[in-house]
Swiss-Prot record:
CDD domains: KOW_RPL26. One of its GO terms (biological process) is translation. This is Large ribosomal subunit protein uL24. It comes from Corynebacterium urealyticum (strain ATCC 43042 / DSM 7109). InterPro entries: KOW, Rib_uL2_dom2, Ribosomal_uL24, Ribosomal_uL24_CS, Ribosomal_uL24_KOW, Translation_prot_SH3-like_sf. The lineage of its organism: Bacteria, Bacillati, Actinomycetota, Actinomycetes, Mycobacteriales.
Amino acid sequence: MKIRKGDTVIVISGPDKGAKGKVIEAYPKRDKVLVEGVNRIKKHVANSAPERGAESGGIVTQEAPIHVSNVMVIDSDGNPTRIGYRFEDGKKIRVSKRNGKDI
């Protein structure tokens, strides 16, 4: 999976199309990413279950994972781009397909 934690991405399809956010977490085995402020859901939490963002029980709004095919990485110019790879000194470097710069 070419998208990593910390990347800034834009949603290219779905109800949140056009939204930008930072990748909070990546799930490579499921091909999904968790993007800050995108695909927010309401989750009902019991009093005893400590969840992310919940002090006690009730209804919690949090981000849900979104498939990687629905997002694109934003390059240094601020445009959405695909990602390629280049090998330099035996290291794999991610490169923007749009302008050829390192990501």
